[in-house]
């Protein structure tokens, strides 16, 4: 069995780790960074960029640069939270045929699972380069408060990337694993996880290698991106007041504002004031306009205060569900880049009445936890038992549109639970089972996960037939539902797939696209490498010709010039094989030039030595070159 890797698929950044013996290790990417921006971009010529290269060109290519796609994963296009994002991102969010929110680039649509798969592929390649072996299995993390559709979409992303997802693990639980693995400590901890796009809080009990989640709560649309957007709105408003120009209508300016906002936010965690300076942000009839503004930490905190306060209620609910008070929490572990913000740390301290634990790297701890879980599944990590919970209640719609819970939130998973229902009308021969997830009393106010029909119920007065509905949640938090007529034994079951979501055919197509793209990317990379090598050879050959061309025969010089000309012509195209062939031809032709250069150098060195040694006589033997050649 090959290595199983742990991946933190984040909204803003992603990270990959692996067990190195008994120690989890974060793997650096090709750029030498321990985290990779979760950004995918498409260039003019169709080249796909992932991570840092995609982030670098975002300002000049805003409409083709997709960031924070995790906020769309498993969501419907008409979701109010998606509606909000549509006006804040420079790329296009489109409605898919199944009603899901997808993204559109140059007329081509991509599902959020597909875009996430490109990031996962990058993490897979990073691990393979480090391990020197193929990797095809992973543990991937998701926010604890992700619903079934979002978990399924994340699993689909893994499949598209060529990974078998052995386990979907909740981010706070992964962080707790990383925090508690080497500690003899026992007790109750709270994990406060404020990342790039989501907020989670989990209460866990740790002892003797058992990590038991007591409760979890959160908000899957609250994170660093919202803090950035709040600052972007403020900057745009201030600029409009001063200059009368709305920067929100300019996608290039909007992207520059976003980068500046993110940078300012990070700086204000360690300094009390920063300056935002964006020259030539836009122009009007009077000429170019510049944006220059000083921003204090106090002003930024005032702008985002309500966002920080929004994390308090989920913490209180999690404590209540766990049956604990804040004073009974032994330690609060901070996870996610946003927890570096002093205001966030202050709110956590006030809420739990103690200084939060800062001994873990908030950007890496989740990936480390995922790697530990991978080690558990592989058998490399012993004596660790993880007991997680389902974050939201599950149930079905019953008479009058009521939501009837079958599995309550914070139930330990995997779990299985059944309940018997009956018909609402006389002689009813079929029932439609509509499955929902959420905490509201009316089914319509919760998230519908899917529906199916149980047919062929024998005619009987209403209330007589007995229909047993069974919910089965696996260790990934993914739901299976079955309905059985107890009289006939007829059964119907589905693995929940939202009315949206990707079908198997969709996933297979995307897997094939990803494989085809991988081949295309390899070809493109080979072409770039070949071009770079060829360019370098042309440059060095032309330089050498200019300096030493007179030392070779005219025919040899002409042959080199022709080879240079042919290679330059080949460089106008993208045929890697043709470029390689012409490069080899030039390399062969220019060998005579190289010989002439070395001969001249040897003569110069000999003259230098002779000048140095004119006091001392030296004996030397002349070698007959022709004799040597014959005997060789």
Swiss-Prot record:
Acts as a chaperone. The lineage of its organism: Bacteria, Pseudomonadati, Pseudomonadota, Alphaproteobacteria, Hyphomicrobiales. One of its GO terms (molecular function) is ATP-dependent protein folding chaperone. The modification Phosphothreonine is found at residue 198. This is Chaperone protein DnaK. The keyword Phosphoprotein applies. SUPFAM superfamilies: Actin-like ATPase domain, Heat shock protein 70kD (HSP70), C-terminal subdomain, Heat shock protein 70kD (HSP70), peptide-binding domain. It holds the Pfam family HSP70. Belongs to the heat shock protein 70 family. Induction: By stress conditions e.g. heat shock. Transmembrane segments: none annotated. Residues 524-557 are annotated as: Disordered. PROSITE patterns: HSP70_1, HSP70_2, HSP70_3. Gene3D superfamilies: 1.20.1270.10, 3.30.420.40, Actin, Chain A, domain 4 (3.90.640.10), Substrate Binding Domain Of DNAk, Chain A, domain 1 (2.60.34.10). Keywords: ATP-binding, Chaperone, Nucleotide-binding, Phosphoprotein, Stress response. It comes from the Bacteria. InterPro entries: ATPase_NBD (IPR043129), Chaperone_DnaK (IPR012725), Heat_shock_70_CS (IPR018181), HSP70_C_sf (IPR029048), HSP70_peptide-bd_sf (IPR029047), Hsp_70_fam (IPR013126).
